[in-house]
Protein backbone atom coordinates (compact mmCIF):
# COMPACT_ATOMS: atom_id res chain seq x y z
CA UNK A 1 0.00 0.00 0.00
CA UNK A 2 1.35 3.41 -1.03
CA UNK A 3 -0.57 6.22 0.65
CA UNK A 4 -1.08 9.92 -0.07
CA UNK A 5 -2.51 12.34 2.47
CA UNK A 6 -4.57 15.12 0.86
CA UNK A 7 -6.05 18.25 2.44
CA UNK A 8 -9.13 20.26 1.38
CA UNK A 9 -9.44 23.94 0.57
CA UNK A 10 -12.01 26.68 0.97
CA UNK A 11 -15.62 25.63 0.59
CA UNK A 12 -15.24 22.56 2.81
CA UNK A 13 -15.93 24.50 6.03
CA UNK A 14 -18.97 23.84 8.20
CA UNK A 15 -19.94 24.80 11.71
CA UNK A 16 -19.06 21.97 14.08
CA UNK A 17 -16.02 20.82 12.15
CA UNK A 18 -13.38 19.26 14.36
CA UNK A 19 -15.46 19.48 17.53
CA UNK A 20 -16.06 15.75 18.02
CA UNK A 21 -12.46 14.82 17.23
CA UNK A 22 -11.14 17.47 19.62
CA UNK A 23 -13.46 16.15 22.31
CA UNK A 24 -12.26 12.59 21.88
CA UNK A 25 -8.57 12.98 20.96
CA UNK A 26 -6.24 15.19 23.03
CA UNK A 27 -3.89 15.29 20.03
CA UNK A 28 -6.61 16.97 17.95
CA UNK A 29 -7.54 19.35 20.77
CA UNK A 30 -3.88 20.38 21.03
CA UNK A 31 -3.91 21.45 17.37
CA UNK A 32 -6.85 23.79 17.90
CA UNK A 33 -5.25 25.15 21.07
CA UNK A 34 -2.03 25.87 19.17
CA UNK A 35 -3.89 27.73 16.41
CA UNK A 36 -5.86 29.70 19.01
CA UNK A 37 -2.55 30.77 20.57
CA UNK A 38 -1.13 31.71 17.16
CA UNK A 39 -4.15 33.96 16.55
CA UNK A 40 -4.45 35.14 20.15
CA UNK A 41 -5.56 38.63 19.13
CA UNK A 42 -8.85 37.28 17.76
CA UNK A 43 -11.87 38.46 19.78
CA UNK A 44 -13.34 34.96 19.53
CA UNK A 45 -11.01 31.92 19.50
CA UNK A 46 -10.85 30.28 16.08
CA UNK A 47 -11.72 26.94 17.67
CA UNK A 48 -14.99 28.44 18.89
CA UNK A 49 -15.85 29.54 15.35
CA UNK A 50 -15.10 26.02 14.10
CA UNK A 51 -17.08 24.25 16.81
CA UNK A 52 -19.98 26.67 17.38
CA UNK A 53 -20.00 29.28 14.61
CA UNK A 54 -21.69 31.53 13.76
CA UNK A 55 -21.52 30.47 10.12
CA UNK A 56 -21.30 34.10 8.97
CA UNK A 57 -18.03 34.55 10.84
CA UNK A 58 -16.63 31.14 9.90
CA UNK A 59 -17.20 31.77 6.19
CA UNK A 60 -15.24 35.04 6.19
CA UNK A 61 -12.18 34.18 4.11
CA UNK A 62 -9.77 35.46 6.76
CA UNK A 63 -11.29 32.98 9.22
CA UNK A 64 -12.08 30.13 6.85
CA UNK A 65 -8.53 29.60 5.71
CA UNK A 66 -6.85 29.11 9.12
CA UNK A 67 -9.97 27.26 10.35
CA UNK A 68 -9.70 24.61 7.64
CA UNK A 69 -5.96 24.33 8.34
CA UNK A 70 -6.67 23.73 12.04
CA UNK A 71 -9.34 21.13 11.33
CA UNK A 72 -7.24 19.32 8.74
CA UNK A 73 -4.15 19.14 10.95
CA UNK A 74 -6.36 18.02 13.86
CA UNK A 75 -7.65 15.16 11.69
CA UNK A 76 -4.04 14.30 10.85
CA UNK A 77 -3.10 14.32 14.54
CA UNK A 78 -5.97 11.98 15.40
CA UNK A 79 -5.04 9.60 12.57
CA UNK A 80 -1.43 9.57 13.72
CA UNK A 81 -2.60 8.79 17.25
CA UNK A 82 -4.50 5.76 15.95
CA UNK A 83 -2.02 4.60 13.29
CA UNK A 84 1.40 5.97 14.23
CA UNK A 85 3.16 3.66 11.79
CA UNK A 86 1.17 4.85 8.75
CA UNK A 87 3.64 6.89 6.71
CA UNK A 88 2.45 8.75 3.61
CA UNK A 89 4.56 8.56 0.47
CA UNK A 90 3.41 11.98 -0.71
CA UNK A 91 1.21 14.92 0.36
CA UNK A 92 -0.93 17.47 -1.46
CA UNK A 93 -3.61 20.02 -0.69
CA UNK A 94 -6.16 21.98 -2.71
CA UNK A 95 -5.40 25.72 -2.61
CA UNK A 96 -5.07 26.60 1.11
CA UNK A 97 -4.83 22.84 1.73
CA UNK A 98 -1.28 23.05 0.43
CA UNK A 99 -0.40 24.82 3.70
CA UNK A 100 -1.82 21.86 5.63
CA UNK A 101 0.34 19.58 3.49
CA UNK A 102 3.42 21.68 4.22
CA UNK A 103 2.69 21.48 7.96
CA UNK A 104 2.32 17.70 7.65
CA UNK A 105 5.63 17.57 5.77
CA UNK A 106 7.46 19.45 8.52
CA UNK A 107 8.27 22.40 6.25
CA UNK A 108 6.07 24.92 8.10
CA UNK A 109 5.27 25.08 11.82
CA UNK A 110 1.54 25.06 12.54
CA UNK A 111 1.52 28.51 14.14
CA UNK A 112 3.39 30.04 11.21
CA UNK A 113 1.00 28.45 8.72
CA UNK A 114 -2.02 29.74 10.67
CA UNK A 115 -0.72 33.31 10.63
CA UNK A 116 0.18 33.07 6.95
CA UNK A 117 -3.32 31.87 6.11
CA UNK A 118 -4.89 34.66 8.15
CA UNK A 119 -2.84 37.13 6.09
CA UNK A 120 -3.55 35.27 2.84
CA UNK A 121 -7.28 35.20 3.48
CA UNK A 122 -7.37 38.87 4.43
CA UNK A 123 -5.25 39.90 1.44
CA UNK A 124 -7.31 37.85 -1.02
CA UNK A 125 -10.54 39.35 0.33
CA UNK A 126 -9.18 42.89 0.14
CA UNK A 127 -7.64 42.55 -3.33
CA UNK A 128 -10.97 43.03 -5.13
CA UNK A 129 -13.91 45.16 -3.93
CA UNK A 130 -17.12 43.23 -3.19
CA UNK A 131 -19.21 42.59 -6.29
CA UNK A 132 -16.42 43.32 -8.77
CA UNK A 133 -15.26 39.74 -9.16
CA UNK A 134 -16.92 36.37 -9.62
CA UNK A 135 -16.20 32.68 -10.08
CA UNK A 136 -18.10 30.06 -12.06
CA UNK A 137 -17.78 26.30 -12.44
CA UNK A 138 -17.75 25.07 -16.04
CA UNK A 139 -18.98 21.51 -16.52
CA UNK A 140 -18.70 19.20 -19.48
CA UNK A 141 -15.97 20.84 -21.59
CA UNK A 142 -12.31 19.90 -22.00
CA UNK A 143 -9.74 21.98 -20.16
CA UNK A 144 -8.24 23.49 -23.31
CA UNK A 145 -11.68 24.49 -24.57
CA UNK A 146 -12.41 26.33 -21.31
CA UNK A 147 -9.04 28.08 -21.45
CA UNK A 148 -9.80 29.21 -25.00
CA UNK A 149 -13.26 30.46 -24.05
CA UNK A 150 -11.75 32.41 -21.14
CA UNK A 151 -9.36 34.06 -23.58
CA UNK A 152 -12.26 34.93 -25.90
CA UNK A 153 -14.33 36.41 -23.08
CA UNK A 154 -11.35 38.42 -21.83
CA UNK A 155 -10.71 39.87 -25.31
CA UNK A 156 -14.38 40.68 -25.87
CA UNK A 157 -14.79 42.48 -22.54
CA UNK A 158 -11.30 43.87 -22.04
CA UNK A 159 -11.43 42.39 -18.57
CA UNK A 160 -9.89 39.50 -16.64
CA UNK A 161 -11.29 35.97 -16.72
CA UNK A 162 -9.07 32.91 -16.34
CA UNK A 163 -9.23 29.22 -15.54
CA UNK A 164 -8.64 29.14 -11.78
CA UNK A 165 -9.13 25.49 -10.75
CA UNK A 166 -8.60 22.45 -12.93
CA UNK A 167 -10.44 20.16 -10.53
CA UNK A 168 -11.06 17.01 -12.55
CA UNK A 169 -11.86 16.04 -16.15
CA UNK A 170 -14.89 18.04 -17.23
CA UNK A 171 -14.82 20.49 -14.31
CA UNK A 172 -12.94 23.78 -14.47
CA UNK A 173 -13.61 26.79 -12.26
CA UNK A 174 -13.03 30.22 -13.80
CA UNK A 175 -12.43 33.51 -11.99
CA UNK A 176 -12.19 37.18 -12.89
CA UNK A 177 -14.23 40.33 -13.30
CA UNK A 178 -17.94 39.62 -12.92
CA UNK A 179 -18.86 40.87 -16.40
CA UNK A 180 -16.13 38.79 -18.03
CA UNK A 181 -17.23 35.70 -16.13
CA UNK A 182 -20.80 36.36 -17.30
CA UNK A 183 -19.57 36.54 -20.90
CA UNK A 184 -17.66 33.30 -20.42
CA UNK A 185 -20.84 31.60 -19.24
CA UNK A 186 -22.59 32.71 -22.44
CA UNK A 187 -19.76 31.26 -24.53
CA UNK A 188 -19.87 28.01 -22.53
CA UNK A 189 -23.59 27.63 -23.22
CA UNK A 190 -22.97 28.20 -26.94
CA UNK A 191 -20.44 25.34 -26.91
CA UNK A 192 -22.89 22.98 -25.22
CA UNK A 193 -21.35 23.12 -21.76
CA UNK A 194 -22.95 23.98 -18.46
CA UNK A 195 -21.90 26.52 -15.86
CA UNK A 196 -22.97 27.65 -12.44
CA UNK A 197 -21.86 30.47 -10.16
CA UNK A 198 -19.52 29.63 -7.29
CA UNK A 199 -20.51 31.48 -4.13
CA UNK A 200 -17.24 33.01 -2.96
CA UNK A 201 -16.27 36.38 -1.57
CA UNK A 202 -13.57 37.12 -4.17
CA UNK A 203 -12.26 35.80 -7.52
CA UNK A 204 -9.47 33.56 -6.27
CA UNK A 205 -6.55 32.20 -8.32
CA UNK A 206 -6.58 34.75 -11.14
CA UNK A 207 -4.60 37.88 -12.03
CA UNK A 208 -6.87 40.04 -9.86
CA UNK A 209 -5.15 38.42 -6.87
CA UNK A 210 -1.72 39.88 -7.71
CA UNK A 211 -1.94 42.46 -4.88
CA UNK A 212 -2.60 39.62 -2.44
CA UNK A 213 0.33 37.66 -3.84
CA UNK A 214 2.62 40.63 -3.22
CA UNK A 215 1.49 40.89 0.40
CA UNK A 216 2.03 37.18 0.96
CA UNK A 217 5.46 37.37 -0.68
CA UNK A 218 6.55 40.00 1.82
CA UNK A 219 5.46 37.80 4.73
CA UNK A 220 7.09 34.67 3.32
CA UNK A 221 10.37 36.55 2.86
CA UNK A 222 10.74 36.55 6.65
CA UNK A 223 10.22 32.78 7.00
CA UNK A 224 12.79 30.00 6.63
CA UNK A 225 10.98 26.72 5.90
CA UNK A 226 12.45 23.49 7.22
CA UNK A 227 13.38 20.57 4.95
CA UNK A 228 10.39 18.51 3.83
CA UNK A 229 10.16 15.13 5.54
CA UNK A 230 7.61 13.98 2.93
CA UNK A 231 7.26 15.11 -0.68
CA UNK A 232 4.56 17.71 -1.38
CA UNK A 233 3.00 18.12 -4.83
CA UNK A 234 2.50 21.80 -5.71
CA UNK A 235 -0.78 23.20 -7.03
CA UNK A 236 0.77 25.49 -9.61
CA UNK A 237 2.49 22.83 -11.70
CA UNK A 238 1.42 19.44 -10.35
CA UNK A 239 5.03 18.58 -9.54
CA UNK A 240 6.87 17.90 -6.25
CA UNK A 241 8.45 20.85 -4.47
CA UNK A 242 11.86 19.22 -4.54
CA UNK A 243 13.13 21.13 -1.51
CA UNK A 244 12.08 23.83 0.93
CA UNK A 245 13.82 26.59 -1.00
CA UNK A 246 10.80 26.74 -3.33
CA UNK A 247 8.14 27.20 -0.64
CA UNK A 248 8.03 30.99 -0.98
CA UNK A 249 7.96 30.95 -4.78
CA UNK A 250 5.30 28.27 -5.12
CA UNK A 251 2.97 29.65 -2.44
CA UNK A 252 3.18 33.14 -3.93
CA UNK A 253 2.53 31.87 -7.46
CA UNK A 254 -0.44 29.89 -6.18
CA UNK A 255 -2.40 32.96 -5.05
CA UNK A 256 -2.91 34.36 -8.56
CA UNK A 257 -2.27 31.13 -10.43
CA UNK A 258 -4.49 28.18 -11.25
CA UNK A 259 -4.88 25.21 -8.92
CA UNK A 260 -4.00 22.23 -11.13
CA UNK A 261 -5.61 19.60 -8.94
CA UNK A 262 -6.10 17.06 -11.73
CA UNK A 263 -2.36 17.21 -12.42
CA UNK A 264 -1.61 16.84 -8.70
CA UNK A 265 -3.70 13.66 -8.53
CA UNK A 266 -2.10 12.27 -11.68
CA UNK A 267 1.37 12.99 -10.28
CA UNK A 268 0.53 11.06 -7.11
CA UNK A 269 -0.85 8.14 -9.12
CA UNK A 270 2.28 8.12 -11.29
CA UNK A 271 4.34 8.01 -8.08
CA UNK A 272 2.64 4.72 -7.27
CA UNK A 273 -0.04 5.94 -4.86
CA UNK A 274 -2.91 3.47 -4.60
CA UNK A 275 -4.66 4.85 -1.50
CA UNK A 276 -5.65 8.43 -0.66
CA UNK A 277 -6.59 9.69 2.79
CA UNK A 278 -8.50 12.98 2.79
CA UNK A 279 -7.94 14.82 6.07
CA UNK A 280 -10.30 17.66 6.89
CA UNK A 281 -13.92 18.73 6.63
CA UNK A 282 -16.11 17.35 3.86
CA UNK A 283 -15.47 14.85 1.10
CA UNK A 284 -14.87 17.17 -1.84
CA UNK A 285 -11.43 15.83 -2.70
CA UNK A 286 -12.63 12.23 -2.61
CA UNK A 287 -15.12 13.04 -5.35
CA UNK A 288 -12.57 14.88 -7.47
CA UNK A 289 -9.97 12.13 -7.12
CA UNK A 290 -12.47 9.49 -8.21
CA UNK A 291 -13.26 11.54 -11.31
CA UNK A 292 -9.57 11.64 -12.19
CA UNK A 293 -9.09 7.93 -11.46
CA UNK A 294 -12.25 5.86 -11.59
CA UNK A 295 -12.33 3.39 -8.71
CA UNK A 296 -9.61 5.17 -6.73
CA UNK A 297 -9.39 4.10 -3.09
CA UNK A 298 -10.08 7.18 -0.94
CA UNK A 299 -10.77 7.37 2.79
CA UNK A 300 -12.08 10.68 4.17
CA UNK A 301 -11.43 11.57 7.81
CA UNK A 302 -13.39 14.40 9.41
CA UNK A 303 -14.88 13.02 12.65
CA UNK A 304 -14.54 10.01 15.00
CA UNK A 305 -16.80 7.75 12.93
CA UNK A 306 -14.99 8.40 9.65
CA UNK A 307 -11.66 8.02 11.46
CA UNK A 308 -12.74 4.63 12.79
CA UNK A 309 -13.76 3.54 9.30
CA UNK A 310 -10.50 4.73 7.76
CA UNK A 311 -8.40 3.07 10.45
CA UNK A 312 -10.23 -0.23 9.95
CA UNK A 313 -9.77 -0.12 6.18
CA UNK A 314 -6.14 0.98 6.32
CA UNK A 315 -5.31 -1.65 8.93
CA UNK A 316 -6.70 -4.41 6.72
CA UNK A 317 -5.08 -3.21 3.49
CA UNK A 318 -2.12 -5.24 2.21
Regions found by a protein language model. Give the residues of each.
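Non-catalytic positions within long, well-ordered alpha-helices that form the structural scaffold/packing
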Residues: 269-272
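Short, charged, surface-exposed secondary-structure boundary motifs
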Residues: 307-313
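Short, solvent-exposed amphipathic alpha-helical segments in soluble enzyme
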Residues: 23, 152-154, 189-190, 286, ...
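Alpha/beta catalytic cores of group-transfer enzymes, especially the acyltransferase/condensing modules
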Residues: 11-12, 37-42, 105-257
Amino acid sequence: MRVAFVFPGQGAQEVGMGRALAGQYPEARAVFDAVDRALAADPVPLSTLCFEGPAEALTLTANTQPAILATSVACLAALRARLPSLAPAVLAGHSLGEYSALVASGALPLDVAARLLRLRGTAMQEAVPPGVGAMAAVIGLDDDVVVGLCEEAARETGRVVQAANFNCPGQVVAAGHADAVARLRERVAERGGKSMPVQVSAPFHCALMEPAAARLDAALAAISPSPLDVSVVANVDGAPYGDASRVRELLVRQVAGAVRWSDCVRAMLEAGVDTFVELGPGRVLAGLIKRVQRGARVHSVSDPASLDAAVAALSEAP
